Amino acid sequence: IKLGAEKVLGVDIDSESIVNSRENAETNEVGEELILGVGSVAEILVGKFPFKSAPLVVANILAPVIVRLFDGGLADLIEDGGSIILSGILQEQKKSVLEAAQAKHLTMTEWRQRGDWVALTMSR
């Protein structure tokens, strides 16, 4: 939001994560612009939340979960011409995430590593 996003949707399956996100948003004075809710990729796609896709999607989840989410529609959240930033990936799991993303016609545009952890940016 502070970098110019008009709307932001934060979704997690864990209600405590949503509580923490709300507190962080209020601390950073962006609470009113942020939509938060408990849900899943499938629930986003069927319209439980105000929008079903975005130009930028961010997921900070362990690699095996990211791979499963690609099978559950994660790539469908990305608007045409958009990107997804994936983090929470161990270096040795990078290949499996790349393969899952490429199977959904995403292309890696950037990656970064810090210690054993990797973050990938994929584009549609």
Predicted regions: what they are:
Residues 89-124:
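Active-site capping/gating segments
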Residues 1-40:
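Conserved SAM/SAH cofactor-binding pocket of Class I
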Residues 55-68, 88:
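A short SAM/SAH-binding and catalytic strip from SAM-dependent methyltransferases
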Residues 18-19, 66, 94:
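Short alpha-helix immediately C-terminal to the canonical SAM-binding loop
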Residues 42-56:
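A short acidic, Gly/Pro-enriched loop at the edge of an enzyme's catalytic core
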Residues 37-46, 117:
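Conserved SAM/SAH-binding loop
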